Amino acid sequence: MSERLKILNNIRTLRAQARECTLETLEEMLEKLEVVVNERREEDSQAQAEIEERTRKLQQYREMLIADGIDPNELLQTMAANKAAGKAKRARRPAKYQYKDENGELKTWTGQGRTPAVIKKAIEEQGKSLDDFLL
């Protein structure tokens, strides 16, 4: 809570601040505060109505499923199984290029991601092309 809201929430501080204001100013502030409170009540009641409507619809669909002989838990299990089956890992890409690194070891590269420094250096400085490194 911000400091300003803490001041509004403390009766002693409000009384001290109110002594410095005219009655007209205090009444104007009260009207504005009432408008804000009413707006907030309206928002809360609208949100509650939306929740109740959603709950009513969910209950209606549940009853329709039961009337058709479908157990809602069975439907959820089927949905979860389909979701799990759809998340298969993709196959590893086969190597497309072969090169020797700084240590003289033979390495491969799929062509995905950053170009290895050895290949990049050979292309830029020695005038080679990627085709020279094909497997």
UniProtKB/Swiss-Prot annotation:
GO terms for molecular function: bent DNA binding; DNA-binding transcription repressor activity; minor groove of adenine-thymine-rich DNA binding; protein dimerization activity; structural constituent of chromatin; transcription cis-regulatory region binding. One of its GO terms (cellular component) is protein-DNA complex. Transmembrane segments: none annotated. It is found in: Cytoplasm, Nucleoid. Pfam families: Histone_HNS, Histone_HNS_N. Its main location: cytoplasm. The keyword Cytoplasm applies. InterPro entries: H-NS-like_N, H-NS_C_dom, H-NS_C_dom_sf, Histone_HNS, Histone_HNS_N. Keywords: Cytoplasm, DNA-binding, Repressor, Transcription, Transcription regulation. It comes from the Bacteria. A DNA-binding protein implicated in transcriptional repression and chromosome organization and compaction. Binds nucleation sites in AT-rich DNA and bridges them, forming higher-order nucleoprotein complexes and condensing the chromosome. As many horizontally transferred genes are AT-rich, it plays a central role in silencing foreign genes. A subset of genes are repressed by H-NS in association with other proteins. Belongs to the histone-like protein H-NS family. Homodimer that oligomerizes on DNA into higher-order complexes that form bridges between disparate regions of DNA compacting it. Interacts with Hha and other similar proteins. This is DNA-binding protein H-NS. It comes from Serratia marcescens. The gene is hns.
